[in-house]
């Protein structure tokens, strides 16, 4: 992932890398719980794996804020792919996050009806732009790859136009950024 964490460390940031539940790592599957089955079971109980993971990240921020080297007024979050998903949703729910970068996830969610973010009636309530409304007026950046084979760049561009309206409406267009990069 381009050594994101190392680059942040070199710039003087305190970084955290939460351990999240994924059924894969690199090219080989990791043995353990089936993520989709676990998510389905959690949804029967009224929650989801996404909600559990966002809660874990928020608790990690609690712990980090107790450390003297962490300025709790300058918390930022960035993530790539699933990390971009967790960044979008955690920043929407945890207002301690003052700036967030969601890379290679943000899109027109209706194109990707995966169990991780498909809930009863969600299309009538929250697409990615509406989740962004919960981040606004805090700083938010979306990065997408022009050659992403998973999430289409045109969907991300269209959804970002809808999201940007929240910042524009408050006269804060500089706090929202959409970037498509070669890759």
Q: Where are the regions a protein language model picked out?
A:
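Primarily recognizes the serine-hydrolase "nucleophile elbow" in alpha/beta-hydrolase
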Residues: 11, 58-124, 128-131
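Structural recognition of the beta-strand scaffold that forms the well-ordered cores
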Residues: 15-18, 76, 99-102, 134, ...
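Residue-level marker for beta-strand->alpha-helix junctions and adjacent short loops that shape enzyme
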Residues: 22-23, 82, 107, 147
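Extracellular/periplasmic catalytic domains that process cell-envelope and extracellular macromolecules
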Residues: 8-10, 134-136, 171-172
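Cap/lid segment of the alpha/beta-hydrolase catalytic domain
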Residues: 1-66, 109-116
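Alpha-helix capping and helix-loop boundary segments enriched in small/acidic/polar residues
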Residues: 44-52, 78, 119-127, 150-154, ...
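The feature captures the conserved acid-bearing segment of alpha/beta-hydrolase catalytic domains
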Residues: 99, 108-168
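C-terminal catalytic histidine-bearing segment of alpha/beta-hydrolase fold enzymes
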Residues: 161-183
């Amino acid at each position: 992932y381009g050594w994101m964490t190392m680059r942040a460390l070199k710039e003087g940031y305190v970084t955290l890398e939460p351990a999240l539940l994924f059924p894969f790592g690199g090219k080989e599957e990791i043995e353990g719980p089936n993520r989709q089955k676990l998510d389905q079971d959690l949804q029967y109980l009224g929650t989801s794996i996404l909600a559990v993971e966002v809660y874990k990240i928020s608790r990690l921020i609690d712990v980090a804020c107790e450390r003297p080297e962490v300025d709790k007024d300058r918390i930022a979050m960035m993530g790539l792919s699933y990390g971009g998903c967790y960044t979008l949703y955690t920043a929407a729910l945890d207002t301690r996050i003052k700036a967030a970068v969601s890379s290679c996830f943000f899109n027109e969610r209706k194109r990707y009806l995966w169990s991780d973010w498909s809930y009863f009636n969600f299309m009538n309530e929250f697409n990615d732009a509406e989740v962004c409304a919960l981040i606004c007026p805090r700083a938010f950046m979306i990065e997408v790859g022009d050659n992403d084979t998973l999430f289409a760049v045109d969907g991300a561009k269209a959804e970002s136009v809808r999201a940007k309206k929240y910042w524009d409406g408050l006269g804060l267009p500089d706090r929202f950024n959409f970037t498509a990069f070669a890759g």
